[in-house]
Swiss-Prot record:
Leading EC class: transferase
Pathway: Bacterial outer membrane biogenesis; LPS core biosynthesis
Protein name according to UniProt: Lipopolysaccharide heptosyltransferase 3
Domain of life: Bacteria
Pfam families: Glyco_transf_9
InterPro entries membership: Glyco_trans_9, LipoPS_heptosylTferase-III, LPS_LOS_Heptosyltrfase
GO cellular component: cytosol
Length: 340
């Protein structure tokens, strides 16, 4: 659990703890760069950040000892671990919590790891949300919250609505985030353009979003240039995670690949179309009952994880026509009286 989308998949655990222990103060330890996606969650007392692997060794060491000092001072009663990172086991050993629970990872069976926790729980469930919740089994909690959550302040939506007004976008808009961290999770730009044209023909505005990376912005621009009527690109690379949550929450539909925004759409209960390639499309799928998911494995054989080529665009086998058909299932047939 190290990326932005992963953090949203931990929120049912946070909500379940808060529901069963309403007076508890729940702190979350996560990578520093993923803090923004949970920054507005009202059920979290404090967020503590770990330096990521790109940081200098000296920065990581200083950060580690700072965390030890701060976390020890908090005198926790309970630690719940949802990651297989070695540094966490070391940290947990240095904290004096009475109960320390972790998932029992098959590749973490050393005596050092196992003795770092008071309880090791076998992973259960077909989806990561179910697997995360299963770690609470030793607590014997009465009820579990099984919905992911994404929180944002009113100011985030106020800014997004202002930007939409400036771009001439009304209430009937669709958000598409075509980008992902790696090419094997991406879909063809031309197919995104075809889907956008279909949405425009049905009377919907389209807002393209992305990260600020130059490759992401280049992808957005190429998609826009391939459309008969360009979508709104002014927000690409320019929104915070809480703002993205607000934007997607008020959208009629979200379309995206295996990346954090799809999990945001699930968390705010916006209808979504999700495209997966050579990844576990069941375990990592967005946690939503209001979704149509496409998996490239339904169109051609997918490689195992150890044989996966990270430079191959596996999603290319998914036809634009199939995604457009899914649009018609999730959206009202037309907002203008026209159709393809």
């Amino acid at each position: 659990m190290r990326f932005h989308g992963d953090m949203l998949l931990t929120t049912p655990v946070i909500s379940s703890l808060k529901k069963n222990y309403p007076d508890a103060k729940i702190d979350v330890l996560l990578y520093q760069d993923t803090i923004p996606i949970l920054s507005e969650n009202p059920e979290i007392n404090a967020l503590y950040g770990i330096k990521n692997k790109k940081a200098k060794a000296s920065e990581k060491i200083a950060n580690f000892f700072h965390l030890i000092k701060v976390l020890r001072a908090n005198k926790y009663d309970l630690i719940v671990n949802l990651t297989d990172q070695w540094m966490v086991a070391i940290l947990v050993r240095l904290l004096n919590a009475r109960v320390k629970i972790s998932q029992d990872y098959h590749h973490r069976q050393s005596a050092f790891w196992r003795k770092s926790f008071t309880h090791l729980v076998p992973l259960q469930g077909g989806n990561v949300v179910e697997s995360n919740l299963s770690v609470l089994t030793p607590l014997g909690v009465d009820s579990l919250v099984k919905q992911t959550t994404m929180s944002y302040p009113p100011a985030s939506w106020k800014r997004m609505r202002r930007e939409l007004d400036h771009a001439g976008v009304g209430q009937n808009y669709v958000v598409i985030q075509p980008t992902a961290r790696q090419i094997f999770k991406c879909w063809d730009n031309a197919k995104f353009s075809a889907v956008i044209d279909a949405l425009h023909a049905r009377g919907y505005e389209v807002v393209l979003t992305s990260g600020p990376d130059k490759d992401d912005l280049a992808c957005v621009n190429e998609i826009a240039q391939g459309c008969q009527t360009p979508p709104v690109t002014a927000l690409a690379g320019k929104v915070t995670f809480p703002e993205l949550g607000a934007l997607i929450d008020h959208a009629q539909l979200f379309i995206g690949v295996d990346s954090a925004p799809a999990h945001i759409a699930a968390a705010v209960n916006t209808p979504l179309i999700s495209l997966f390639g050579a990844t576990d499309h069941i375990f990592w799928r967005p946690w939503s009952n209001n979704m149509i998911q496409f998996w490239a494995g339904d169109y051609r054989e997918m490689p195992t994880r150890d044989q996966r080529d990270r430079n191959e665009m596996y999603l290319s086998v998914i036809p634009a026509a199939d995604v457009i058909a899914a649009v018609d299932k999730l959206l009202p047939s037309s907002t203008t009286g026209t159709s393809l």
